[in-house]
From Swiss-Prot:
UniProt-listed Enzyme Commission number(s): 2.4.2.9
Keyword annotations: Allosteric enzyme, Glycosyltransferase, GTP-binding, Magnesium, Nucleotide-binding, Transferase
Pfam families the record matches: UPRTase
Name of the featured protein: Uracil phosphoribosyltransferase
Matches recorded under InterPro entries: PRibTrfase_dom, PRTase-like, Upp_B, UPRTase/APRTase, Ura_phspho_trans
Positions annotated to bind uracil: I193, G198, D199, A200
CDD domains attached to this UniProt entry: PRTases_typeI
GO molecular function: GTP binding; magnesium ion binding; uracil phosphoribosyltransferase activity
Length: 212
């Protein structure tokens, strides 16, 4: 199964705070960034390094850097923006590509309305970020788009994932690893994750939440 649930105590603690029904926009937004940063730490643990020489205080010293072109972070709009600052706090030199995906509330199917990809994306690791992996349709559509653009290495980070979404991504793109803070129980009849976080986009942006 192409998924890794990160059960670090800090992540579990922060995710518990995010599940509160009475959480403020400010606190939800800050916690989304913090958990995004912690997931980034785990999702980049196996990146390839290369050596190079620098002038240190005592002379030349060999140090390491991440090999290859700069990573591109791919937030799925709009909710993915809520994790972006947390990811960039650890990878400040990353390039940002943006993909806008909207979900039909009746069919639960996704359609892409925006794509702004960085140059030479075929030579970069792409890290997709989205708070929720529910039906998986938005994630699958984004991966489809990236692969069509030539991207060969793709990873995804989500705060909460439903088994249905995991299965959809695994079926369509078994080569893409998903990192999540929690694998939750299920989707309800409206396509919301249970117990989930509610509508993460509305909580991040302070807009009116729909009934689950």
């Amino acid at each position: 199964m192409p998924i890794r649930e990160i059960r670090h105590p800090l992540i579990r603690h922060k995710l518990g705070l995010m599940r509160r029904a009475d959480i403020s926009t400010k606190n939800f937004r800050e916690l989304a960034q913090e958990v995004g940063a912690l997931l980034t730490y785990e999702a980049t643990a196996d990146l390839t390094l290369e050596n190079y020489d620098i002038q240190g205080w005592a002379g030349t010293v060999s140090v390491e850097k991440i090999a290859g072109k700069k990573i591109t972070v791919v937030p799925i709009l709009r909710a993915g923006i809520g994790m972006l600052d947390g990811v960039l706090s650890l990878i400040p030199g990353a390039k940002v590509s943006a993909v806008g995906v909207a979900r039909n509330e009746e069919t639960l199917q996704a359609h892409t309305y925006l794509e702004k990809l960085v140059p030479e994306i075929d030579e970069r690791l792409a890290m997709i970020i989205d708070p929720m992996l529910a039906t998986g349709s938005s994630m699958v559509a984004t991966i489809d788009l990236l692969k069509k653009a030539g991207c060969k290495e793709i990873r995804a980070m989500v705060l909460v994932a439903a088994p249905e979404g995991i299965a959809a991504v695994e079926k369509a793109h078994p080569d893409v690893m998903i990192y999540t803070a929690s694998i939750d129980e299920r989707l309800n009849e409206h396509g919301y994750i249970i117990p989930g976080l509610g509508d993460a986009g509305d909580k991040i942006f302070g807009t009116k939440q729909k009934d689950a």
